[in-house]
Amino acid sequence: MVVQAVAFDIGGVLERVAPPDRWLGKWQERLGLAAAEFQAALAGVDPGDVIKTGGLSEAQYRQRYAAVLGLSGAQVEEFIADMWDWYCGELDHELTRYAASLRPRFATAIVSNSADGARREEQTRYGFAGLFGTIIYSHEVGLAKPDQRIYALLCNQLGVPPDEVVFVDDLQENVDAAIEFGIHGVLHRSTTESIDVIDSLIAT
């Protein structure tokens, strides 16, 4: 086996997860809602968990948030802006520089469970399109991790068999599904550890 491609998750890997008070905690306090009441309202936005597979457009989930929380037009704009600030977190500059340095020796990719609007927001902030050759957003392809079909799509777009791909994700179930598909899965715990593991795999 010779590794030809390395793929990364975004949230929790290339982006550090932001604290909840950047978005939901802030708005629960602002609207004066109890935690249970606030969570019950939010559950009505995406009860079938379909945002990540493209079942709700950005316009649709904006409307739903406005309806369940009773937001005015100006409030929903601010709410969504806060959502994207939270969603995009903080860039892990070290890991992102490392990922970019792998090209052109290796094909590089992103596979992210996402919501409509994510490509725009993350490109604006971090310019991923200039750093990675292949970018797969779940809401755009109708498939989400840990569904193994998204890994099949990754390999197809890369033109590389599974056993020649390394994939880094912070969720065990996503890593396990990738491994079961035949990909070399790496559970992200820290930047240093992930870089060391990738280096060991691409050196073999």
Annotated model-derived regions:
Residues 1-8, 115-204:
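Asp-based, Mg2+/Mn2+-dependent phosphohydrolase catalytic module
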Residues 22-26, 60, 64, 82, ...:
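Alpha-helical elements of Rossmann-like donor-binding domains used by nucleotide-donor carbohydrate transfer enzymes
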Residues 9-12, 54, 102, 110, ...:
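Generic structural signal for small/hydrophobic residues in well-ordered secondary structure
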Residues 45-60, 86-95, 180:
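Short amphipathic alpha-helical segments at helix boundaries and their inter-helical linkers
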Residues 31-42, 70-81, 162:
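Short, surface-exposed acidic
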Residues 48-80:
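A metal-dependent, Asp-based hydrolase signature
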Residues 1-43, 180-181:
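Active-site neighborhood of HAD-like aspartate-dependent phosphohydrolases
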